[in-house]
C-alpha cells in the first residue's frame, strides 16, 4: 500500500511545486484502487506518514522517486478489469422500466435505478420504459413530468417509451373489477383503526365474506362517487406472518384534484395494483428495485398468481446510503417555496440539476452507478469516487489559473517588475500560456506573519516586515528556491492587483467565496471548467461585466 500511496502523492506534490495535497490525492487513490476503500483508516495513516517523507525531499528527489516507483507514469497504469454485471434468465427481448413519482426532479438516488436499467437494456438490446407513477395527486408536482425526462436525457439514459399512470385509470379499473368478480378482492368500509386491530390478530373483517355480486355493486357505487371512506382490498393470507401483507388495499377514494385529470376520477389504484398490471401489460422481463421493496414483491406475486401471469425476474439490490445533500423531495420543495433554497439546482441539494450546476459530468455519475451495481449488500455512496471519476473527465480540458480568496493586499519593496509565463495546462501545450506581471503590489489569501519568509509561487522569496491597516508590507529577499526550503518557507500563490478579475465561487454548502483571479481568466466562457490552483476545480456559471460566478465542483 505504501508504494501506491507514495506514487500518487509524489505525482500530486510535483504538480503543486513540491507540496503534497493529501485530500486531492485521496480521491484519485480510491478511484483507481477500489480495493483500498475497505481500509480507509489505515490508508489515512499511511498518507500522513508518506506526506512527512515527501515534504523532506527536494523537488528533484521527488521526481526521481516517482520515476523509480512508476517509470511509465501513473497515467499509463493498466486499469483493473471489472467483471461486468449481468442479468439472470435473459430469454429473448429484455424489457425494463424506470418508474419515478413525479414529485420533483431526479436526485442521486434515482440515478442508480435509471442508470442500471439503461445499462442493461443497452447491453441486451432491450427496451426501457419510463413510467411516471402519479396516482397519488398529493405528491405530484406538475412541472416534474418534463423535468424528469430532461434529467434522464442529461444523464445519458435512453427512454424508448413513456407511460403516465394517471392516463391508464380505466385499465386499472378493468383489472380491479376482474379481481372482484373472481372473488379475490372485496370492498371494505371498515374503520381504518378497526381493520388494523383485526389484521394484527389475524381476524377477517365483516366485509371479507361478502359475495362477488355484492362487491361489484359496491364497486360501481365507488366509481359513481356514491361512497366515501372505503377501499378495495386484495384477499391474501389473513394469518400471514407479516401483518402488512394481510388483505392489503389496492384501490382507495381520493378527492384531491389531480394535475392531469382534475376531478374526473376519484377512485385511484394503490401502487401494488397499478405496478403489477403495468409490468404485465408492458411485458417487463426484469424488475430492478431496492431490497426495501421485497415485501411489495410478495404482495404483487399474489396478483400475478390470481391472473395466472408470468412473474418477471426480480432483482433486489441493497440500500445506497448517501450522506450530505438534501434528498427529500418534500423538504426540497418546501425550502424552495420558503426561499431557503434558490431552486432545484441549489448546491446544497442532491438533485441531478444541482450536480450539473456544480460541474459533475453525467458520464462520471453513470460510471459510478454501474460500478455500484446490483449487489444485495448496502453500500455507502462515496463522494470521493464520484469526484475522482469526474476529475478524470474534466482535468484534460481544465485550464489552470491562480485564484485568491478573501484577498489581502501585499506591497513588496526591493524587487524589480517581473513578467512570468505559466502554462494554461501542465500536459497540453496547445492550450497556450498565461502571463502574470509583478509590479510591486499583489493579492494573497494567506495569513502571513511578520518576520517570516515566504516563497511566492514561480517568483521569489520575501520576508514580511509589517501589517498596517489590513495591508501587508514585505521586502524582497532572494530568488533561490533552495533558500526558501532551508528556511522552511511556505509557498503561496498570488495575483497582481492590477487587472485582477473579481470572482465569486459558490461551494457545496451554497456559501459564497469572494476573491480575485488573474487577468487571463477573462478568456474563459460560461460552462467552462477550470482549475484554480491549490483551490479546486470550478465550473464557470455566469460571465458578467463586473466579474464571474463559478461553482466549486470538487478539489
Curated annotation (Swiss-Prot):
EC numbers on record: 6.1.1.17
Entry GO MF terms: ATP binding; glutamate-tRNA ligase activity
Full protein name: Glutamate--tRNA ligase
UniProt function note: Catalyzes the attachment of glutamate to tRNA(Glu) in a two-step reaction: glutamate is first activated by ATP to form Glu-AMP and then transferred to the acceptor end of tRNA(Glu).
Family membership: Belongs to the class-I aminoacyl-tRNA synthetase family. Glutamate--tRNA ligase type 2 subfamily.
Organism: Methanococcus maripaludis (strain C7 / ATCC BAA-1331)
Keyword Metal-binding assigned: no
InterPro entries named among the record's database cross-references: aa-tRNA-synth_I_CS, Gln/Glu-tRNA_Ligase, Glu-tRNA-synth_arc/euk, Glu/Gln-tRNA-synth, Glu/Gln-tRNA-synth_Ib_cat-dom, Glu/Gln-tRNA-synth_Ib_codon-bd, Rbsml_bL25/Gln-tRNA_synth_N, Ribosomal_bL25/Gln-tRNA_synth
Pfam families in the cross-refs: tRNA-synt_1c (PF00749), tRNA-synt_1c_C (PF03950), tRNA-synt_1c_C2 (PF20974)
'HIGH' region (motif): residue ranges: 100-110
Location in or out of the cell: Cytoplasm
Catalysed reactions listed for this entry: tRNA(Glu) + L-glutamate + ATP = L-glutamyl-tRNA(Glu) + AMP + diphosphate
Keyword annotations: Aminoacyl-tRNA synthetase, ATP-binding, Cytoplasm, Ligase, Nucleotide-binding, Protein biosynthesis
Amino acid at each position: 500500500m505504501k508504494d501506491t500511496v507514495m506514487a500518487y502523492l509524489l505525482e500530486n506534490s510535483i504538480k503543486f511545486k513540491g507540496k503534497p495535497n493529501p485530500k486531492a490525492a485521496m480521491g484519485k487513490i480510491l478511484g483507481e484502487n477500489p480495493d483500498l476503500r475497505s481500509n480507509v483508516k489505515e490508508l489515512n495513516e499511511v498518507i500522513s506518514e508518506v506526506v512527512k517523507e515527501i515534504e523532506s525531499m527536494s523537488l528533484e528527489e521527488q521526481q526521481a522517486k516517482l520515476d523509480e516507483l512508476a517509470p511509465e507514469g501513473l497515467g499509463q497504469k493498466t486499469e483493473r478489469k471489472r467483471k461486468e454485471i449481468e442479468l439472470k434468465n435473459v430469454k429473448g427481448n429484455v424489457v425494463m422500466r424506470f418508474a419515478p413519482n413525479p414529485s420533483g426532479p431526479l436526485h442521486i438516488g434515482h440515478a442508480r435505478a435509471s442508470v442500471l436499467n439503461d445499462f442493461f437494456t443497452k447491453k441486451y438490446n432491450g427496451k426501457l420504459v419510463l413510467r411516471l407513477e402519479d396516482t397519488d395527486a398529493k405528491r405530484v408536482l406538475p412541472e416534474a413530468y418534463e423535468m424528469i425526462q430532461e434529467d434522464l436525457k442529461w444523464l445519458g439514459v435512453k427512454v424508448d417509451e413513456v407511460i403516465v399512470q394517471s392516463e391508464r385509470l380505466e385499465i386499472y379499473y378493468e383489472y380491479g373489477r376482474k379481481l372482484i368478480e373472481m372473488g379475490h378482492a372485496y370492498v371494505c368500509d371498515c374503520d381504518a383503526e378497526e381493520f388494523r386491530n383485526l389484521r394484527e390478530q389475524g381476524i377477517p373483517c365483516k366485509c371479507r365474506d361478502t359475495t362477488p355480486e355484492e362487491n361489484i355493486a359496491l364497486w360501481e357505487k365507488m366509481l359513481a362517487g356514491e361512497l366515501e371512506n372505503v377501499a378495495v382490498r386484495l384477499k391474501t393470507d389473513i394469518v400471514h406472518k407479516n401483518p402488512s401483507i394481510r388483505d392489503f388495499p389496492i384501490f382507495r377514494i381520493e378527492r384531491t384534484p389531480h394535475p392531469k385529470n382534475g376531478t374526473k376520477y376519484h377512485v385511484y389504484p394503490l401502487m401494488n395494483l397499478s405496478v403489477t398490471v403495468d409490468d404485465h401489460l408492458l411485458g417487463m422481463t426484469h424488475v430492478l428495485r431496492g431490497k426495501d421493496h421485497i415485501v411489495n414483491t410478495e404482495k404483487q406475486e399474489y396478483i400475478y398468481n390470481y391472473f395466472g401471469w408470468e412473474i418477471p425476474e426480480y432483482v433486489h439490490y441493497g440500500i445506497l446510503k448517501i450522506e450530505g445533500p438534501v434528498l427529500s423531495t418534500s423538504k426540497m420543495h418546501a425550502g424552495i417555496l420558503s426561499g431557503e433554497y434558490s431552486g432545484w439546482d441549489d448546491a446544497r441539494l442532491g438533485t441531478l440539476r444541482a450536480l450539473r450546476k456544480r460541474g459533475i459530468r453525467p458520464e462520471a455519475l453513470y460510471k459510478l452507478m454501474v460500478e455500484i451495481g446490483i449487489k444485495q449488500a448496502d453500500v455507502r455512496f462515496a463522494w470521493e469516487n464520484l469526484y475522482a471519476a469526474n476529475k478524470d473527465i474534466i482535468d484534460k480540458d481544465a485550464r489552470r489559473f491562480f485564484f485568491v480568496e478573501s484577498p489581502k493586499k501585499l506591497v513588496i519593496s526591493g524587487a524589480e517588475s517581473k513578467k512570468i509565463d505559466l502554462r494554461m495546462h501542465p500536459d497540453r501545450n496547445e492550450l497556450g500560456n498565461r502571463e502574470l506581471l509583478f509590479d510591486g503590489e499583489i493579492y494573497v489569501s494567506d495569513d502571513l506573519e511578520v518576520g517570516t519568509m515566504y516563497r511566492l509561487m514561480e517568483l521569489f522569496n520575501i520576508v514580511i516586515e509589517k501589517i498596517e491597516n489590513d495591508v501587508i508590507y514585505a521586502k524582497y529577499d532572494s530568488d533561490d528556491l533552495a533558500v526558501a526550503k532551508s528556511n522552511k518557507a511556505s509557498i503561496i500563490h498570488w495575483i497582481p492587483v492590477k487587472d485582477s478579475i473579481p470572482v465569486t465561487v459558490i461551494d457545496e454548502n451554497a456559501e459564497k467565496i469572494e476573491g480575485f483571479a488573474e487577468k487571463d481568466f477573462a478568456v474563459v466562457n460560461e460552462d467552462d471548467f477550470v482549475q484554480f490552483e491549490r483551490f479546486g476545480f470550478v465550473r464557470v456559471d455566469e460571465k458578467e461585466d463586473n466579474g464571474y460566478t463559478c461553482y466549486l465542483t470538487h478539489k
